[in-house]
């Protein structure tokens, strides 16, 4: 094997090491190694300022000899680590006979704001042999209730001195706020609880408190604002101290959307902070934001706006303004406003945005009065600049995703977003600067206004890639360069559009949480990144944004405030929770969202007649070659709405089943069947579309959502194949149809055709954009071509993840890793090797540990390496031309303790595998 060999070698090495260690150790050879990767709720590791007083506990079993599965566990929870494991004062689960090692509910004493909690777990293996106790884990709750806040909202009235933006919108001047305070004793512990109506950066005694980017993030501000907790113990000392906070408009007080929408176009940005200090003598002090603070708008950040960029005037720098020595006599008194109950203050539910990757400039293009720096990767974030300048000159920094054929910046697709930063130099020499309260989508950076006597150097510009602070969750690679580039484009599209919320695009005057884009890409995102907490947090925003009539807005948070809905978009509220549940096994995501799902299905029903939908729809958005030239494509809106009505009813029924709500399950199953019957009667006859335009998507919806009677499904499949054949074996699908294409063709046995569609080089196809130089997924199948240039439409994002939904099929079918039971308790590993591939590999972190699948065809032999994590089982399908040729670890296959034959068919063998690492080989030719 050549692909991901290191993954399997390290797995074997770890296994060998622990076997050796367990043999050699004389400390306690009868006790198993402790559990690992302990987390709470949606994957948090020892969080500070946690949001939930009723967490769940999860862990993984170690990869060691003797640990196949879990037969029992015990969790102990205490208010002090000294009480563990023998004297837990908050909860002792006692020994529970269960294989469950994930999402176990806390059932102890009530927890309260600020409380620090410590916990451990031990498990018993399949032979009832006990493990060591795990290392002590902890979490600390944030301020859970508005009543916990004694601080006030503070700030200056900045609208009066604001400047007009590109759409005559008011841009609020960024504010600088500070407070000097005295502590009489040595500090034992200090917590800073802080948030903003806007975005903030905070420092204490001249030291940055964190490296968070634009906290607290983006939520439905009229319903909820998230708060952040920082441990600032090491930044505070006895005596005089100073806290300083910068605040800018961000999402809260800036314009959003192409229609100049706002959360508040009149309210000035504000901060809310509460510093709680415990002294070594046990006394306490609280420093709160109130009317004793002072502030100014005369700092160096003159303008900061998400769409238009940031302006920094170094002449106005205020050295040491967050230290005790700074003189603020010319600063103003702030205005103070009480915390009310109308807007909920809650600890942040997922990770903040961070600066994650730094890209180097790869090429410089010199112009008469400018230099263009090419990072050779479309990215999202800000530039890090080290540029020589003359005193008083202004450096202009522009951004673009691509260059026009004549070498000029292509910015038509930014629309009204100016996306331009400025730096005004206060002295001669090299300036070092990075914007703070804006972000851009770009590959190219153009500089003008630098010292013309200097020759531009690549080290002048670096790209700082910023996105929500999640880790990778899987990997995929293959023998095909363009398929690997597609995987890279999917990952970079995810990075670029997971900026606190799932955005449609990161560069133009939108960057909003479009629900349709989110629902089609959600499953793929979970293969590539650890984004459960990200999605769970955003789904709370979806719940908070749901209209009283049950409708779900186009975008969440709902800054458009137009009361409109769309089928296929609003259905995010049923699709995402179910997809998350099936990939994590966490019932909690269904419990949280079940009421919303029911309300949405009721809204579907209210906007239908005789079960046929009359709901508005963006439809199969950006379908290629539309007959009417419309962005909404050719598939009937009523057909789409009815299909999603049925699908959401079915998912709600399945959710009710998981939650044990039998009567409601029956109600929604009956509704699904009624809608499906009405769908078929209205739009199909003998499996063929009638009365509306027949499209690939119309058949895909009918088949994927199981809306046809059994006797008509086969004809519908043939009609779909005819539509694909009429398109010269190319797709004709937009946002809603594309994610269903691979699923339906797979289920109908048309694997060769799906491979053909995936590996097509010409428009419309995934490789078409790659052939034009794409490094991210595009909004349109034809956003650009080398022959014809840019699509003339300004709605032409070059970083738009929707068509990256194909990534789900790449993981689940090319390499074959899929759940057979919710949460991967039972795993399917069923790769489908096909030309032009000769190899493919993937890894995936499941709730139980890493699963891996790697195959290669060589000398008419399939080599398949598989990793099955502890506490799971896997059904492994091995394609072969000769079942008698199957070998495992270089030995002829026989039934044994760890591998049992399930089925032996003509072209494949199915085996039930226990946890472990296996190397299969069998005769197979492409």
Swiss-Prot record:
EC class of the enzyme, as a word: hydrolase
Residues anchoring lipid (N-palmitoyl cysteine): 26
Similarity comment text for this entry: Belongs to the glycosyl hydrolase 78 family.
Lipid bilayer topology: Lipid-anchor
Function: Alpha-L-rhamnosidase involved in ulvan degradation. Ulvan is the main polysaccharide component of the Ulvales (green seaweed) cell wall. It is composed of disaccharide building blocks comprising 3-sulfated rhamnose (Rha3S) linked to D-glucuronic acid (GlcA), L-iduronic acid (IduA), or D-xylose (Xyl). Alpha-L-rhamnosidase converts Rha-Xyl-Rha3S, the product of a sulfatase acting on Rha3S-Xyl-Rha3S oligosaccharides, to Rha and Xyl-Rha3S. The enzyme is able to degrade p-nitrophenyl-alpha-L-rhamnopyranoside (PNP-Rha) in vitro.
GO MF annotation: an example: alpha-L-rhamnosidase activity
Designated name of the protein: Alpha-L-rhamnosidase
Induction: By ulvan and rhamnose.
Signal peptide: 1-25
UniProt-listed Enzyme Commission number(s): 3.2.1.40
Reaction(s) this enzyme catalyzes, per UniProt: Hydrolysis of terminal non-reducing alpha-L-rhamnose residues in alpha-L-rhamnosides
UniProt main location, coarse: membrane
GO CC terms of this entry: plasma membrane
Catalytic residue list: 510, 779
Binding positions for alpha-L-rhamnose per the UniProt entry: 504, 508-510, 517, 569, 800
Lipid-modified residues, S-diacylglycerol cysteine kind: 26
Covalent S-S links between cysteines: none
């Amino acid at each position: 094997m050549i692909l991901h060999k290191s993954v399997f070698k390290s797995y074997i090495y770890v296994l060998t090491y622990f076997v050796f260690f367990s043999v050699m150790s004389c400390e306690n050879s009868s006790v198993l190694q402790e559990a690992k990767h302990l987390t709470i709720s949606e994957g948090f590791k020892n969080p500070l300022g946690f949001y939930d007083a009723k967490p769940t506990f999860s862990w993984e079993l170690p990869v060691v000899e003797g640990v196949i599965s879990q037969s029992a566990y015990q969790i102990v929870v205490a208010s002090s680590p000294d009480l563990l494991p023998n004297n837990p004062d908050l909860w002792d689960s006692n020994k529970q006979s269960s294989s469950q090692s994930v999402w176990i509910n806390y059932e102890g004493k009530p927890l309260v704001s600020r409380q620090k909690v410590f916990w451990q777990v031990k498990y018993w293996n399949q032979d009832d042999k006990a493990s060591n106790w795990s290392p002590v884990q902890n979490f600390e709750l944030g301020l859970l209730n508005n009543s916990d806040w004694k601080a006030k909202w503070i700030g200056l009235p900045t609208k009066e001195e604001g400047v007009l933006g590109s759409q005559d919108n008011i841009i609020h001047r960024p504010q600088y706020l500070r407070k000097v305070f005295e502590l009489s004793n040595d500090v034992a512990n200090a917590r800073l609880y802080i948030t903003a109506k806007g975005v903030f950066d905070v420092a204490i005694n001249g030291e940055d408190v964190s490296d968070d980017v634009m906290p607290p993030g983006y939520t439905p501000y009229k319903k909820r604002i998230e708060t952040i907790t920082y441990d600032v113990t090491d930044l505070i000392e006895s005596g005089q101290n100073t806290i300083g906070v910068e605040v800018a408009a961000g999402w809260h007080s800036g314009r959003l959307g192409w229609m100049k929408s706002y959360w508040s176009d009149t309210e000035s940005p504000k901060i809310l902070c509460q510093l709680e200090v415990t002294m070594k003598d046990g006394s306490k002090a609280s420093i709160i934001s109130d009317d004793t603070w002072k502030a100014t708008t005369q700092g160096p950040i003159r303008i900061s706006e998400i769409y238009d960029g940031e302006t920094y005037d170094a002449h106005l720098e205020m050295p040491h303004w967050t230290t005790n020595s700074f003189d603020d006599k010319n600063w103003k008194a702030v205005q103070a406003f009480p915390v009310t109950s109308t807007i909920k203050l809650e600890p942040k539910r997922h990770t903040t945005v961070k600066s994650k990757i730094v890209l180097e400039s790869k090429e410089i293009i010199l112009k008469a009065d400018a230099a263009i720096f090419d990072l050779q990767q479309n990215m999202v974030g800000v530039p890090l600049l080290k540029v020589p300048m003359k005193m008083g000159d202004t450096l202009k920094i522009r951004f673009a995703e691509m260059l026009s054929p004549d070498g000029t910046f292509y910015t038509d697709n930014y629309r009204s977003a100016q996306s331009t930063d400025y730096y005004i130099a206060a002295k001669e020499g090299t300036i070092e600067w990075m914007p703070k309260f804006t972000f851009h989508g770009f590959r190219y950076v153009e500089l003008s206004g630098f010292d013309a006597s200097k020759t531009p150097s690549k080290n002048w510009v670096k790209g700082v890639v910023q996105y929500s602070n999640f880790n990778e969750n899987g990997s995929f690679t293959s023998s095909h360069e363009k398929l690997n580039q597609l995987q890279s484009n999917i990952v970079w599209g995810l990075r670029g559009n997971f900026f606190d919320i799932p955005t449609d695009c990161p560069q133009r005057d939108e960057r909003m949480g479009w629900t349709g884009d989110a629902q089609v890409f959600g499953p793929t995102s979970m293969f590539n990144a650890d984004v459960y907490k990200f999605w769970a947090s955003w789904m709370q925003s979806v719940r908070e944004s749901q209209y009283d009539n049950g409708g779900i807005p186009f975008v969440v948070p709902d800054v458009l405030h137009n009361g409109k809905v769309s089928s296929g978009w609003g259905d995010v509220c049923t699709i995402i929770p179910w997809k998350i549940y099936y990939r994590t096994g966490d019932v909690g995501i269904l419990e949280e969202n079940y009421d919303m799902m029911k309300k949405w299905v009721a809204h579907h029903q209210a906007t239908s007649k005789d079960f046929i939908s009359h709901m508005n729809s963006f439809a199969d958005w950006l379908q290629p070659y539309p007959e009417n030239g419309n962005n909404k494509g050719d598939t009937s809106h009523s057909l789409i709405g009815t299909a999603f009505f049925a699908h959401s009813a079915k998912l709600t029924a399945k959710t009710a089943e998981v939650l044990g709500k039998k009567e409601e399950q029956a109600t929604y199953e009956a509704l699904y069947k009624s809608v499906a019957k009405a769908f078929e009667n209205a739009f199909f006859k003998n499996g063929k579309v009638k009365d509306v335009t027949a499209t690939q998507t119309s058949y895909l919806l009918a088949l994927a959502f199981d809306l046809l009677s059994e006797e008509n499904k086969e004809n519908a499949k043939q009609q779909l194949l005819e539509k694909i054949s009429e398109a010269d074996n190319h797709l004709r699908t937009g946002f809603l149809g594309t994610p269903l294409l691979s699923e339906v063709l797979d289920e109908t046995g048309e694997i060769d055709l799906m491979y053909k569609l995936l590996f097509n080089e010409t428009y419309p196809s995934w490789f078409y954009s790659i052939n034009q130089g794409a490094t991210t997924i595009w909004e349109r199948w034809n956003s650009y071509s080398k022959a014809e240039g840019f699509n003339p439409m300004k709605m032409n994002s070059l970083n738009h993840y929707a068509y990256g939904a194909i990534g789900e099929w790449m993981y689940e079918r090319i390499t074959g890793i899929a759940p057979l039971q919710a949460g991967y308790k039972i795993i399917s590993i069923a790769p489908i090797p096909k030309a032009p591939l000769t190899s493919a590999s993937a890894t995936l972190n499941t709730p139980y540990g890493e699963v891996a699948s790697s195959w290669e065809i060589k000398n008419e032999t399939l080599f398949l390496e598989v990793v099955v994590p502890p506490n799971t089982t896997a059904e492994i399908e091995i394609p072969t031309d000769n079942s008698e040729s199957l070998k495992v670890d270089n030995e002829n296959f026989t039934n044994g303790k760890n591998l049992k034959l399930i089925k032996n068919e003509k072209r494949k063998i199915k085996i039930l595998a226990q946890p472990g690492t296996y190397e299969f080989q069998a005769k197979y030719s492409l």
